[in-house]
Swiss-Prot record:
Lineage start: Bacteria, Pseudomonadati, Pseudomonadota, Betaproteobacteria, Burkholderiales
Protein name as catalogued: Methylglyoxal synthase
GO biological-process terms attached to the record: methylglyoxal biosynthetic process
Function as written in the Swiss-Prot or TrEMBL entry: Catalyzes the formation of methylglyoxal from dihydroxyacetone phosphate.
One Pfam family in the UniProt entry: MGS
Known EC number: 4.2.3.3
Active site feature: D64 (proton donor/acceptor)
Top EC class for this record: lyase
Molecular function as annotated in GO: methylglyoxal synthase activity
Domain called MGS-like: residue spans: 1-133
Annotated Gene3D superfamilies: Methylglyoxal synthase-like domain
NCBIfam families: MGSA (TIGR00160), PRK05234.1 (NF003559)
Organism of this sequence: Cupriavidus taiwanensis (strain DSM 17343 / BCRC 17206 / CCUG 44338 / CIP 107171 / LMG 19424 / R1) (Ralstonia taiwanensis (strain LMG 19424))
Length: 133
């Protein structure tokens, strides 16, 4: 049996409600995975969805970079990063570095809910789990 997927969950402020709703819909599958998240997102997933999440720093304080470092070490299976394309982010270079690391290391990265749905369905199929959702 393959190892548990280790999934990073990240969301910009205007997308936090979306990632909480997404995680709630997929709670059964996500609870079978190892999860890590940036600080505020992780706190909401713990408090509102009841998931076990390893929290990094908040994104603007280096959380995206912490996740990127683990990804570069081969310790992240997939990234769900719900980005807000309409709001400038003060830590945009960190965000670009994380997405680039996904590309360099061939780690799937979903940046909107539609692609995140497909990503989880693929992980569930690959890991023989019940369909995500």
């Amino acid at each position: 049996m393959p190892p548990k997927p280790r999934i990073a969950l990240i969301a910009h402020d205007h997308k936090k409600d979306d990632i909480v709703a997404f995680a709630a819909r997929h709670r059964a599958f996500l609870s079978q995975c190892e999860l890590l998240a940036t600080g505020t997102t992780g706190g909401r997933l713990i408090d509102e969805v009841g998931l076990d999440v390893t929290r990094m720093l908040s994104g603007p304080w280096g959380g995206d970079l912490q996740i990127g470092a683990q990804l570069a070490e081969g310790r992240v299976s997939a990234v769900v990063f719900l980005r807000d394309p309409m709001t400038p982010q003060p830590h945009e270079p960190d965000i670009n570095a994380l997405v680039r690391a996904c590309d360099v290391h061939n780690v799937p990265c979903a940046t909107n809910v539609a692609s995140a749905e497909l990503l989880l369905a693929g992980l569930a199929r690959e890991n023989g789990a019940a369909q995500a959702g």
